[in-house]
UniProtKB/Swiss-Prot annotation:
Gene coding for it: hb
GO MF annotation, one: DNA binding
Name the UniProt record assigns to this protein: Protein hunchback
Native organism: Drosophila disjuncta
Gene Ontology biological process terms from the UniProt entry: segmentation
Any GO CC annotation of this UniProt entry: nucleus
């Protein structure tokens, strides 16, 4: 119903409405003639509205509505800053060998960006927060970075044996099933290459 009530006002008188909409409190209290001009100016295009009171009330409601939206946007921005660290930690903790080749190159350049922004954000309000790691402000960032880095190192350390161990198990099974060594070599090479290429 906001758009329905404000559509005629905005179309006919966008400048004055915009001014009063942003400075409703100041204009009404500090400048009485402004409030009078507002009621007089809004009276011509008040045909859909019953009285001059709804515009002032709806303007106040709109200001509160805008303030709520700004607060929500700030909360969303804070959540977005926290999300990269959580997603990075989650990606680092998932021990999936198939996605590791895709995650490891993305995570190495991806880790410094959120960490730098968080550390800079801590440096601006209180430099001591970063120097003393025991403070709660710096502790989450350092621990999260350490966890992500440790998990990333563990994944990278696990990938060479994981790439080596799977070929051994099919090689044993193929040795028992396929007697000819030539067929075993062709099968193991082609199947292993196809597995890790895909």
């Amino acid at each position: 119903w906001y758009s329905g009530m404000f559509a005629p006002n905005i179309k006919q008188e966008p400048i004055s409405h915009h001014h009063h909409h942003h400075h409703a409190h100041h204009s009404h209290h500090q400048h009485p003639h402004d409030s009078n001009s507002n009621s007089n100016a809004s009276s011509p295009h008040q045909s859909p509205l019953p009285s001059p009171n709804p515009p002032s009330n709806t303007i106040l409601q709109l200001e509160q509505y805008l303030k709520q939206q700004q607060q929500q946007q700030q909360q969303q921005q804070q959540q977005q800053q926290q999300q990269p660290m959580d997603t990075l930690c989650a990606a680092a903790m998932t021990p999936s060998p198939s996605n590791n080749d895709q995650n490891s190159p993305l995570m190495l350049p991806g880790l410094p960006n959120p960490m730098q922004s968080i550390m800079l954000a801590n440096l601006r309000p209180s430099p001591t927060a970063t120097t003393t790691t025991t403070t709660p402000a710096a502790a989450p960032t350092t621990t999260a970075a350490a966890i992500a880095l440790q998990a990333n190192d563990k994944l990278q350390a696990l990938t060479p044996p994981m790439d080596v161990t799977p070929p051994k198990s099919p090689a044993k099974s193929q040795q028992s099933c396929a007697e000819p060594e030539k067929e075993h070599d062709l099968m193991s090479n082609s199947s292993e290459d196809m597995k890790y290429m895909a």
